[in-house]
């Protein structure tokens, strides 16, 4: 018996696959913004499968970056006022009762008496200097040990013809004496003995309660016949005075000039038996000073017409 073989074709199947991406959650910054991606399209069975993740056809809006807060402008720097001098009194602080001290500056003409007082009271060297006629003075207030002190520097003429008519008023109620000489002028140093005798004649002796100091000015000037420091120190020791050498012209010596007068002011502040001028006395001295300067001006004009 013969066998019959029947070939049965294999069954064919059609498979349709649908790939769905998982949902993605995106936070929206505005109500009208999209929060999810659109659904992907089904893939054709004959199309090759892409192993890379599906990219949504519709773009998804992302939140806008938040701008940093604006940086506030830097505060404007406060412009500082003019530099105050050392130990200048403050207007917001209360001090003890103010005292006024009268300090006279004596010495030959052109030794720098006016320049020294200008440097201490005004903090600079005068641009133009002229010979002093009669008497002039400058003031400055300083705070020493919480006490407000006012110092008056009386500058007198070095010429003999002007000095004779003012000595009676010039040496009255004096609290301290400053002798000045020019280190480049030996004559001004030799005449210091005459100035000391004149002070002693009016009661300002070396062993009194009125302090005295000696200042050698113009130490910045080169000179062959210069008064040596040793010679000046010996003279100061014999007359019970402290010696200082400085220059009123040099800006680098400004602190030195400052310390000289502040040292004297410290000594005045610590000394107890001392006459301190009242307001009425200061007003009277101011009137006398104006009268003296007017009289000296008239005398100069009269001398100009002499034959």
From Swiss-Prot:
GO terms for biological process: Rab protein signal transduction. It is found in: Cell membrane. GO terms for cellular component: endosome; Golgi apparatus; plasma membrane. Its main location: membrane. Residues 19-80 are annotated as: Disordered. SUPFAM superfamilies: P-loop containing nucleoside triphosphate hydrolases (SSF52540). One of its GO terms (molecular function) is GTP binding. It comes from the Eukaryota. PROSITE patterns: RAB. InterPro entries: P-loop_NTPase (IPR027417), Rab33A/B (IPR041822), Small_GTP-bd (IPR005225), Small_GTPase (IPR001806). A motif (Effector region) lies at residues 129-137. CDD domains: Rab33B_Rab33A. Residues 42-56, 65-75 have a biased composition (Pro residues). A lipid is attached at residues 306-307 (S-geranylgeranyl cysteine). GTP binds at residues 107-114, 155-159, 217-220. It is a lipid-anchor. Belongs to the small GTPase superfamily. Rab family. This is Ras-related protein Rab-33. It comes from Caenorhabditis elegans.
